[in-house]
Amino acid sequence: MEVIPKKYFLRTAKKYKKKHYDLSKVNKVVSLIEKEDFEQLYAKHKLGVIRGTHPPLYHVHVDRAYNDDWLLFYFGADNKIYLSALGDHNLIEHISKIFND
């Protein structure tokens, strides 16, 4: 599967990098998504779906040990994975607007 970061994801990743978050943990989660290892995504990263989005927009906790409020938002279409954003639980409320733009 091809992984494609959206512009908003790149902006939010830059913000988290400036805050000294370990972005290699994002890469580990993305590799689990690529491998379709849903068992580990559910158990370790609390994979969830945001209702009302089409195609379905998923969120996973990047690093629950360090910060349980650090989420990766993504969706899949046409055998590709689109990384939408990095954020927190407050972003879930606003993600429909960002996602549908």
PLM regions and their residue ranges:
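A short, surface-exposed loop/turn module that caps and links secondary-structure elements
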Residues: K35-A65
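A structure-centric signal for secondary-structure junctions around beta-strands
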Residues: N27, K44, D68-D69
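Residues that form or immediately flank small-molecule/cofactor binding pockets and catalytic motifs
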Residues: Y8, P55, D88
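Enriched for short, Lys/Arg-rich terminal
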Residues: Y21, V62-D101
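Arg/Lys-rich, positively charged N-terminal/basic patches that mediate binding to nucleic acids
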Residues: M1-L32
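A residue-level signal for beta-strand positions that form part of recognition/binding surfaces
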Residues: E2, L57, K80
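Aromatic side chains
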Residues: F9, Y16, Y58, F73-Y74
